[in-house]
Amino acid sequence: METQPEVPEVPLRPFKLAHQVVSLTGISFERRSIIGVVELTIVPNSENLRLIRLNAKQLRIYSVVLNDVCQADFTYFDPFQNICYKEHKSRALEVYSKHHLTAAQYTDPDVNNGELLIQVPPEGYSMIQEGQGLRIRIEFSLENPKCGVHFVIPPASTDEETQMNSSHMFTNCYENSSRLWFPCVDSFADPCTWRLEFTVDKNMTAVSCGELLEVIMTPDLRKKTFHYSVSTPVCAPNIALAVGQFEIYVDPHMHEVTHFCLPGLLPLLKNTVRYLHEAFEFYEETLSTRYPFSCYKQVFVDELDTDISAYATMSIASVNLLHSIAIIDQTYISRTFMSRAVAEQFFGCFITSHHWSDTWLAKGIAEYLCGLYSRKCFGNNEYRAWVQSELARVVRYEEQYGGIILDCSQPPAPLPVSGTNQSAASSKQQEIVHYFPIKSLHTVSPKYVEAMRRKAHFVIRMLENRIGQELLIQVFNKQLALASSAATTKIGAGLWSQLLISTNIFIKAIFTVTGKDMSVFMDQWVRTGGHAKFSLTSVFNRKRNTIELEIRQDYVNQRGIRKYNGPLMVQLQELDGTFKHTLQIESTLVKSDITCHSKSRRNKKKKIPLCTGEEVDMDLSAMDDSPVLWIRLDPEMILLRDLIIEQPDFQWQYQLRHERDVTAQFQAIQALQKYPTNATRLALTDTIESERCFYQVRCEAAHSLTKVANQMVASWSGPPAMLNIFRKFFGSFSAPHIIKLNNFSNFQLYFLQKAIPVAMAGLRTSHGICPPEVMRFLFDLFKYNENSRNHYTDAYYRAALVEALGETLTPVVSVAIHGTQITTDSLSTDAKLVLDEVTRLLNMEKHLPSYKYMVSVSCLKVIRKLQKFGHLPSLPHIYRSYAEYGIYLDLRIAAMECLVDFVKVDGRSEDLEHLITLLETDPDPAARHALAQLLIDNPPFTRESRSRLDKPNLVDRLWFSINRLPYDTKLRCDIVDLYYALYGTKRPNCLQAGENQSFYKDLMKDNNSSVGSVTGSFKKTSDSKSHLPTPTNTLDNEPQERQKPAMVTIKRTATEAFEVGDEIIKLERSEEITVLDEPVNVQAYDSETKVNALQADEEARDTHQAAKRLKNEMYAEDDNSSTMLDVGDSTRYESSHEEGKLKSGDGGLKKKKKKEKKKHKHKHKHRHSKDKDKDKDKERKDKDKRDPHISRLQARETATPDTLSSEDSSNSNSLPPMNLN
C-alpha cells in the first residue's frame, strides 16, 4: 500500500481578488463546447508574489497573459484524476478516504491551493507591487463537459424546429464547482465584482447574474452579446448561466423579478410564480432589510439534478416544479422550494461562509427563514408537522451513519472537571468516525450534506428558543446591515470580509445583541455530533399525590446518540390544567417527583382546561387514580432528540382526542398501534371523522386504524374499517355505495379521500387476504370515478387508487404444477382483476398522460408487487424500457426503483451491471443521482450477506469509478456511499474469498502433479495423506461469518443461468428451493483438474457417463428428485476422504445401502423389483471387494438414475466432484 501523501504547508492567499471578467464568445450546441476568456484583477499583498494558484478543471488552457503584455508559464495538476486506483490490494474505503481528503486539500482554494499554477516570469516582477492591481488574462475552451455545464439537446429523431426551440444549456455546479466552466478562485470566502459577457445565437437568450446592461448584435447580425454587471461583491460559486430560447415573464407585482421558461410552458409558469412576490415582502418585513440585490431572475430548465439552485440575483429551477392551477399537491412543494431560493439570496449568496465548516450557518438560517414563511403561508399545523418530520429524518440519519458535526474546524472545549461531578469529567464523548472525510465539501456524502442542512435548521430553532425570536432576527439584521454597508465600498477599504459569516463571528454577534455567550451551546450542538435519546416512565403515588418520573438515557453508546446534559421540559396535562416543569438532566438516569396540582375527581369534574386556554368536556371513566391525563416531553421540539414515552393506553387516547398540538397527536397515533382494543378503535375512528383535526393527522389515523383492525381481526364486528366513513363523506345520498362526482374544493377532504382507500387496502382477514368487500369497494371507485365537473385534476387520486390495488395483493399460496409457466389462467380472480385494471390504465396513459405520469408511476410499482408475490413471471424488461433516457424523469425513477428491487430479489449479474452502466453513463444527472440513492437505500447485497452478485469484477468497476470521476463530485460521492453500502469500510469479502480459492487450487494442482509422478494413480494411503493439504487449513483466514451455515432460497427460472465453477448451467424449468448454505464436502479434487484415479480408457469413459447422469439428475424435470446447490466462485471445498471411511467393512456398506434404499423408496414412491435391487447391491459389493480404494464416483457408475438421485438427496455433503464439461 502506498503511503499517504502529505499536503504541503501553504500560507494564506498572497493576494486579494478585486474584479473578474468572464467572456464566453463561442457557445456551440452542435459540438457541446464553449470558447472563452477570463480576466482576473488581483491585488498582491506583497511584491514577492511569484506563484499564483487558481482553480480550473476539465478546461483546455491556451494562454496566460499578465497585464496584456507578459506571457506566463503555467502547469495543471488535478489529483482527482487518479485518487488511489493503484491500491489494487486494499480496495478498502478506510484507505481510500485518506487519499480522497488529500486530493481535495491539494486543490482547496481556502488554503491557497488550486489545479492551475501560474508562474510569474522575471519580466513580470516589476508589475507586482503591493496594493496595485494585476490583471491575469486566461484563454480557454471546454468541450463535451462531464459536469458543471449541461447541454440539453433533443434527439435527432425530432423535427429540426422543435430541436432548436427546446435546446438549452445551463450551469449545474455542485456547491463550489464553478471551476468546471471557467478559471477562478472557487471559494465562498473570496467575493469580488463581476462583468459577464455571453455571445449566443440571435434567437437565444443568455440569463446570468447581475443587472443586464445591454444586448449588442454582432457585425454579421447572426449573434448577439448579453452584457451583465454584478456591482455587489459575490463569490465565484454563486455565478451561473443559462442559455436557450426562453419565454420571458416579468412579475406583475415586482418588476425587478423576471421569470424564464422553455417554449410552450408560459401558462404553467404564470400560475406557478404568482405568489412569489409574497416571499420577498415577507423576508424584507421580517428582517427589516431591503433585498440585497437590484434584480432577481428565475429560470426553469430541464434535466436539473436538484429541484432548485440559488445563485447571486438568480435561481435555476427544475421544469418539474411548474404546474397548472388544477394541481393541488405540487403547489406546496413548488412554493416551498422557490421561497427557500429567495431566502438563500440573503444568506448564502449575499452573505457567504468563511469556510466549508461554516456552511451550516448560511444553510440553516435560510432554512429557518423559509420555515417562517411556510408557517405564514400554510399554517402552524403544517409547519409543526414539517418540523417533526425533519427532526425524525435527522435522527434516522445519525443513528444509521453517525453524528453530524456542523463545524468540524475545531473541536469542542473540554468539559470542566469538578470534585463533585467526577463522572462528567471522566466521561468522554465518543469519537465520530464516518466512512468519508467531513473536512472537505468534495469528499462528504450528498446524504450528509442534506442531513446537515436539516440539522443546521434545528440548531437555529434551538437558538431562537434560548434568546427569543425577536433578538435572533436582530442578529440577522445586524449581519445584513454590516454586509450592505461593506458591499458599497471598494476593495481598498478592506471591509469585504463583513460579507462573510463564520461560527465565531455568529457567536460574537449574538453576544453583541443579547449579552449572552453561546460558546457552550455551540460546543454542544455545533462542534459535537449526535442527538439525545430519552426514555420516560411514570408512576403515580396516591399517598403523596405526586407523579414519579424516571428519565433514562440508555442508548448513549449507540451510533449517533450522545449523552445530554441540560434542561428538559416536561409538560403534564392534569384535571385542573396544563403544567410545565423543567428538569435538569445531569446523568443517564434522572428520577423526579412532581407534585400534582389536581386531585383525582373524575366523577365530579368534566370541564378540563387545556394549554390553549379552551375548556373541553372529557369522559373520565377510563381514568385511574392519577389526576394526570397525559405526559409530554420536550413539547416544543427545542432539542435534537428521540423519545420513547411509556404511558397507559387511555392516556394516549386522551392525548389524541383533546391535545391540540399536531405533533402530540402524531405521537399518540403511533403509540396506539400497540393497543388493539375497542377504545383505541373508537378513538382513531373519531379522529378520522373529526373535521377539527388536521388533515395529516386524520390520514395518519386511517393508516394506524388498519394496523389495529388487523390485530383485532378475530373480534372485529361490522363492516370493514373506514368503509362507512368513506361512504359517509363521499358516497351519494340515495346510493352510498356509489361515489359522488369528484369535488376537491375542500382540500382536507381531498387528502382524506386519497388516504382512506390506500389504508383500507391494507386490511386482512383471518386468512391473511384482503376482504372481498374491500376489493369490490376499490373497483367501484374506479368504476364510478367522474372528474368532468371538478376544477382540479384527479391524477393524484387515481394514482392513490392504483397504489391501493397494490396494497391488496398478498403472496401466492397455491402450488402450481411443476414446469408450467405463469399465465393469466393461473392467476387468482382478484389478481387478474388488478392486472387488468393496471394494464388498462398504463395503456391509457400513453394516449392521455396524467400530470407527471403519476398513474403510470403507481402502475409500475403494482406490477413489481405482482411479480414479487408470484402472480407474474419476474422479468425486468418492462422496467428497462421505462428507465431509458427520454422518458419523463419521475417515470424513469419509478422504473429504476423496480429494477433495483428486482436485482436484489431475482436479478443476475448482468442486471446489476445494467444498473451500474446507467449510473455511470446516463445523460441526465438527475436520473444518475436518483438511481444512486435507490441503490444506496436498497443495496443488492451487503457485506454480511452471501450473494452471487458479490463478485470481484463489480468491486473493480466501482473502485475504478470512485477513483476516475474527477469532475462530478456528487456522483463520485454517491458511488462511495454505494461502495460502503455493499462492502463497508473494510476490504470486500469476495476478494479475500477469491484469493483463498485460487490459493487452494494452486495447492491442489501442485499436489496432483507430485502424486501422479510417484504413484501414477490416485490412491489414498497413510503416506499420501500426509502429502495432501487439508482444505480446512486454507479456510482459517476466511471471515468467521462465512463459515456459518444459513438457509438460502434459490430461484430458478426458464431463462436463468447458474454459474458452477467456470461453467454456466441453463435451467429448463422454474422453481424456488431452500437449501443449507454451508461448505460442500467433496473429494480432494481441484475444480479445474480431472480426477486421475482411473487410467484405463474404459474406466475414464464410464466416469464420464456417470458424471453425465449425475448432471442430468441434478436438473431433472421431476421436482421430487432434485436438490440444487449454489456453487459459486467463493465456494469452499472440504475433503471428505478420510482413511477410516474408505476402509470401512461390508457391514457398514450394507447398513448405509439399506438406509439409502428406505429414503429412496419413500421419496419417489416407485415400485422396484426386489430381485433386481439385490442383484445391484451384490454387484456393487463385489466391485468394492475387488478394489477397496476405488473412488466413490466409479463405485456409483452402475447405479440407476433413481438410486443415484436418492443417494444425492439423502446425503448432499457426500457429493462427488462434478465434471460438467
UniProtKB/Swiss-Prot annotation:
Residues 1027-1037 have a biased composition (Polar residues). Residues 1138-1183 are annotated as: Highly charged. Residues 1206-1221 have a biased composition (Low complexity). The modification Phosphoserine is found at S1135, S1136. Residues 845-1213 are annotated as: Binds to Tbp and Taf1. Residues 1011-1044, 1111-1221 are annotated as: Disordered. Residues 1150-1169 have a biased composition (Basic residues). One of its GO terms (cellular component) is nucleus. Residues 1129-1144, 1170-1190 have a biased composition (Basic and acidic residues). Its main location: nucleus. Keywords: Nucleus, Phosphoprotein, Transcription, Transcription regulation. One of its GO terms (molecular function) is general transcription initiation factor binding. Disulfide bonds: none annotated. The keyword Transcription applies. It is found in: Nucleus. Belongs to the TAF2 family. Belongs to the TFIID complex which is composed of TATA binding protein (Tbp) and a number of TBP-associated factors (TAFs). Interacts with Tbp, Taf1, Taf11 and Taf12. TFIID is a multimeric protein complex that plays a central role in mediating promoter responses to various activators and repressors. An essential subunit binds to core promoter DNA. This is Transcription initiation factor TFIID subunit 2. It comes from Drosophila melanogaster. The lineage of its organism: Eukaryota, Metazoa, Ecdysozoa, Arthropoda, Hexapoda. The gene is Taf2.
